[in-house]
Amino acid sequence: MTPKKMSKLDSNKYSKMKAELKHPISYQKICQIKDAAINTIGYSSEAIEYALKTSLTTYLFIDNEIEKLENKISELYLSLDYKIHTIKGIGILTAAGIASEIGNFDAFITRNQILAYAGLEPSKNDSGEHNGNGKMVKHGSAYLRNYLMNAAETFRVYNPSISDFYWKKRNEGKHHRVALSHVARKLVNVIFTLEKHKVDFNPNLVK
């Protein structure tokens, strides 16, 4: 919408526009934009207006396709017997991403195998012992590692005991990403337990 058209926007046109928007703008905000449009020094161009309309149409189409794809992913995930989404702070799309990367949990005998697959196990020094600095080896599935690290952020926010654990690591002098990798390992432990025993998440059992 050009400044010229914006300056002529009335309450009826606003109501129509509001109905078409996924995230409506308040009428007060519209009035502020309208006042700014009235005082804008510029010119009206049909070419620019057409380009804006085309860009908006493309954006809305892509946004709608993404929404349909996300709905399909959620539908497929929920049709399977995964328990990852029951963890407080982890949404269905994130859970679906983790599940898609791990696949069949029966293929993993121990949780350490999942840590290794995600490249989240601690690195070792030349003697073959864990060096204790919390650094990840970063081999394995980068996608799974990213899903788990991102999920670890909300996992610590929504679970007080995990938040305490995170800050304990920070107070030990570890940087955010290192402390978060420790949280991600705890998250893998929780996921492994839920999927192996097919039980829902119980925040009271998280330590």
Please annotate each region the language model reported:
Residues 1-207:
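A detector of single, family-specific signature residues
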